């Protein structure tokens, strides 16, 4: 950078010294100086002797001590003077000589403008090559440089103070040199010097983003001297301020357009500008706010904590969201609650995406927030995609009668329900948390596709699907996606009436009455619901293992088997919202299904075995018939010295009728010191000695007979009790 400046400086000094000589020489010779055609060995143009002497003058010591140059050096500042004198020697060696071989740069005048806006002359384009017919005083610029056209002789002679203007420019050289040294390496400056453009502004990479706007350029591309800097386009533009609130279109979702049927695919760019109208309560402190963005109920983006202002909160947040079948965009304003140490929603707004981007790709909206506030945002949809072509449903989402008609399964129950229920009852009744846990989503997607292809070919063996939760999840997904729920509106009303008429905790319903509740359903729905209720009743019977009581099963299957909204409810207050109605419906769903499961019989349990109670109850014995021999035997009570048997033994019952099957332990299970066999007494021996007749017959060899002589004490007490019972019947005995 310093070399061209030195060449320019000394060329101007040299031009001032050559001007009188050229005039005198021209008058003497009468013809202008001519220069021969340049040649590679001798690039310096030939001139007369007087001109050559003048050209070599500045390089000699005498020329350096000329009074004009001394005056010029005295006018410079000390730092500029030292810089000019220190760089003069290498400049003389490289630039001020008669010519540099191999470069093709002859010695001549070099014009250079360090400050472009101060030079009123526009830059001229560099000629492609040297022109042989040019004058000697004009000179040739170095290759790759873009000098301005030199001034004419008339302008040079008429200039009142060329030395003064040059000195002013030379004062700026140190600062310009320092700035250019910070721009980059020398190689970068060489590339800029070799650029074909003649504009110093593009060479110095100046930026116009910091300058004020100047007047427009003229037709010739020139600008006024004080028009400011130009820009090369690499510098960033000054960011524009936020748009005014009047440029945003007010937007509010009506109550009848909560669920649009269409969907949207693409990339959504959302820029938040601010929140307005959030007026805190009187005396409340500023709150920490944040904004949460949801797409179809799923949280997708969130801002950091923001300090809420009195009325308006300025935002500058941009989010890029991928949309897949998106319908609703919801913005929630969350406020920090120090009591529970968490954020709570204080306002929310909803945007219907398909209707917003209908016919346009960008919208600036002022979204109305509930209960108060406005959200200023710009929504831009890019890379919009068409809705993917969905295949016709074959199992999931197909009406139940149509699926049964296509598959023709046994029992009018779809194959997917039959196969899933069979596998669950075979290997899942004792699994803890059945129907509560969720299986792998990838495996469920694979099984779902298999059912869509061919339900009859699906095998749910334990080797292929060892996780029973995958099968339970597929069953619940199928029931959830039915167009019409299994428990329809008429059945729902019938069950509610039955619950009000016969509560299960007061009067247990009968089997016929519970099954009769399903008579209002069509055949296919009734068969399918009957199979499911039988299955759920069987699962609840194993609640000791799987912890799935009827109440837990009702919680899992209530929202699946019943519709989302059963009956129109009364209009509620605006503050309650749809959440309260959904909670009430969910509670009713659980109660209805719980009632059905409690009162539903389980036909797959084994039927009750024959009643075993008669074996334990005392039988009504027929009257005792005693076989009488020829000598008539008279039965009379025998006197006892002791008291009668205690009352506890009077109703001990007849143990002799129980038989061997009821007492498998044999005859000796009551053997012990108090139940030894009683032998005959002395009185009996005396009677035998006297010769009284002895009762003989079939009872003598029968060990089970009541008069067996091998009776124990307990049997004897039972026999006495029987005799006393028979005597109390007023039987006439012949004496």
From Swiss-Prot:
Annotated C2 domain residues? 249-366
- From the UniProt annotation, give the residues forming the signal peptide: none
Key words, A-Z: GTPase activation, Lipoprotein, Palmitate, Phosphoprotein
Post-translational modification comment from the UniProt entry: Palmitoylated. Probably palmitoylated by ZDHHC3 and ZDHHC7.
According to the entry, every stretch annotated as the Rho-GAP domain falls at: 398-604
- Give GO BP annotations, semicolon-separated: actin cytoskeleton organization; activation of GTPase activity; cell migration; positive regulation of trophoblast cell migration; regulation of cytoskeleton organization; regulation of Ras protein signal transduction; signal transduction
Organism of origin: Homo sapiens (Human)
Q: Where is the composition biased (Basic and acidic residues)?
A: 14-31
Which classification does the entry list for the species?
Eukaryota, Metazoa, Chordata, Craniata, Vertebrata
Superkingdom, taxonomy of origin: Eukaryota
* Composition bias type Low complexity, residue spans: 47-71
Q: What does this chain do?
A: GTPase activator for the Rho-type GTPases. As a GCM1 downstream effector, it is involved in placental development and positively regulates trophoblast cells migration. It regulates cytoskeletal remodeling by controlling the activity of Rho GTPases including RHOA, CDC42 and RAC1.
Tell me, what is one Gene Ontology molecular-function annotation carried by this entry?
GTPase activator activity
InterPro entries named among the record's database cross-references: C2_dom, Rho-GAP_regulator, Rho_GTPase_activation_prot, RhoGAP_dom
Specify where the region named Disordered lies, as residue ranges. Answer: 1-253, 608-651, 674-696
| UniProt-reported outcome of changing residue 408 to Q | In a pancreatic ductal adenocarcinoma sample; somatic mutation
* Residues of the site described as Arginine finger: 436
What is known about the tissue distribution of this protein?
Expressed in trophoblast cells of placental villi.
Entry protein name:
Rho GTPase-activating protein SYDE1
One short Pfam name that applies is: RhoGAP
Segments of skewed composition (Gly residues): 211-221
As stated in the Swiss-Prot or TrEMBL entry, residues carrying the post-translational modification Phosphoserine are 224, 231, 235, 244, 575, 681, 683
Which stretches are tagged as biased composition: Pro residues? 35-46, 122-131
Gene expressing this chain: SYDE1
Single GO cellular component term:
synaptic membrane
């Amino acid at each position: 950078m310093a070399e061209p400046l030195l060449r320019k400086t000394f060329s101007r000094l040299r031009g001032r010294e050559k001007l009188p000589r050229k005039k005198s020489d021209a008058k003497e010779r009468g013809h202008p100086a001519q220069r021969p055609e340049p040649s590679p060995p001798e690039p310096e143009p030939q001139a007369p002797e007087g001109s050559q002497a003048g050209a070599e003058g500045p390089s000699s010591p005498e020329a350096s001590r000329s009074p004009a140059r001394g005056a010029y050096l005295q006018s410079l500042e000390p730092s500029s003077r030292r810089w000019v004198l220190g760089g003069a020697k290498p400049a003389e060696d490289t630039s001020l000589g008669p010519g540099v071989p191999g470069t093709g740069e002859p010695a001549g005048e070099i014009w250079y403008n360090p400050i472009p806006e101060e030079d009123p002359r526009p830059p001229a384009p560099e000629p492609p090559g040297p022109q042989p017919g040019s004058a000697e005083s004009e000179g040739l610029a170095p290759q790759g440089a873009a000098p301005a056209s030199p001034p004419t002789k008339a302008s040079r002679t008429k200039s009142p103070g060329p030395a003064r203007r040059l000195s002013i420019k030379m004062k700026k050289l140190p600062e310009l040199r320092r700035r250019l040294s910070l721009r980059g390496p020398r190689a970068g400056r060489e590339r800029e010097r070799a650029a074909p453009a003649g504009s110093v502004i593009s060479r110095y990479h100046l930026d116009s983003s910091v300058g004020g706007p100047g007047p427009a350029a003229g037709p010739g591309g020139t600008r006024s001297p004080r028009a400011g800097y130009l820009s090369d386009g690499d510098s960033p533009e000054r960011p524009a301020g936020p748009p005014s609130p009047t440029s945003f279109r007010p937007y509010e979702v009506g109550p009848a357009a909560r669920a649009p049927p269409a969907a949207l695919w693409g990339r959504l760019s959302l820029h938040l500008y601010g929140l307005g109208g959030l007026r805190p309560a009187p005396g409340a402190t500023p709150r920490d706010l944040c904004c949460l963005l949801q797409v179809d109920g799923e949280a997708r983006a969130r801002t950091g904590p923001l300090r809420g202002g009195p009325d308006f909160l300025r935002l500058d947040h941009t989010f890029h969201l991928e949309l897949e079948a998106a319908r609703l965009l919801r913005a929630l304003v969350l406020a920090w609650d120090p009591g529970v140490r968490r954020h709570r929603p204080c306002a929310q707004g909803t945007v219907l995406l398909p209707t917003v981007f209908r016919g346009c790709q960008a919208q600036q909206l002022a979204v109305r927030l509930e209960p108060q506030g406005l959200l200023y945002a710009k929504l831009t949809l890019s890379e919009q995609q068409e809705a993917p072509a969905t295949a016709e449903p074959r199992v999931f989402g197909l009406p139940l009668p149509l699926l049964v008609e296509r598959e023709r399964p046994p029992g009018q129950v779809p194959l997917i329900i039959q196969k899933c229920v069979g596998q669950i009852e075979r290997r899942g009744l004792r699994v803890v948390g059945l129907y509560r846990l969720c299986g792998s989503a990838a495996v469920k997607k694979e099984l779902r596709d298999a059912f869509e292809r061919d339900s009859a070919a699906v095998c749910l063996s334990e080797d292929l699907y060892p996780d029973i939760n995958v099968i339970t999840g597929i069953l619940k997904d199928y029931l959830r996606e039915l167009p019409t729920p299994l428990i329809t509106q008429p059945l729902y009303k019938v069950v509610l009436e039955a619950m009000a008429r016969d509560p299960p905790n007061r009067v247990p319903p009968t089997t016929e009455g519970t099954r009769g509740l399903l008579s209002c359903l069509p055949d296919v729905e009734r068969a399918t619901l009957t199979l499911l209720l039988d299955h759920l009743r069987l699962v609840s019977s194993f609640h000791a293992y799987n912890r799935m009581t009827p109440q837990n099963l009702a919680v899992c299957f209530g929202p699946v088997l019943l519709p989302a909204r059963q009956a129109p409810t009364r209009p509620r207050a605006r503050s309650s919202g749809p959440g309260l109605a959904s909670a009430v419906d969910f509670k009713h769903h659980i109660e209805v299904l719980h009632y059905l499961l409690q009162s539903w019989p389980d036909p797959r349990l084994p039927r009750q075995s024959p009643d075993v109670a008669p074996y334990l109850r005392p039988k009504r014995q027929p009257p005792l018939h005693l076989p009488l021999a020829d000598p008539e035997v008279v039965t009379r009570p025998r006197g006892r010295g002791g008291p009668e048997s205690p009352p506890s033994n009077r109703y001990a019952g007849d143990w002799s009728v129980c038989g061997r099957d009821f007492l498998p332990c044999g005859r000796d299970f009551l053997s012990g010191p108090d139940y030894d066999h009683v032998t005959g007494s002395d009185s009996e021996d005396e009677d035998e000695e006297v010769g009284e007749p002895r009762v003989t017959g079939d009872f003598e060899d029968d060990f089970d007979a009541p008069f067996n002589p091998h009776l124990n004490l307990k049997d004897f007490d039972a026999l006495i009790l029987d005799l006393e019972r028979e005597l109390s019947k007023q039987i006439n005995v012949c004496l």
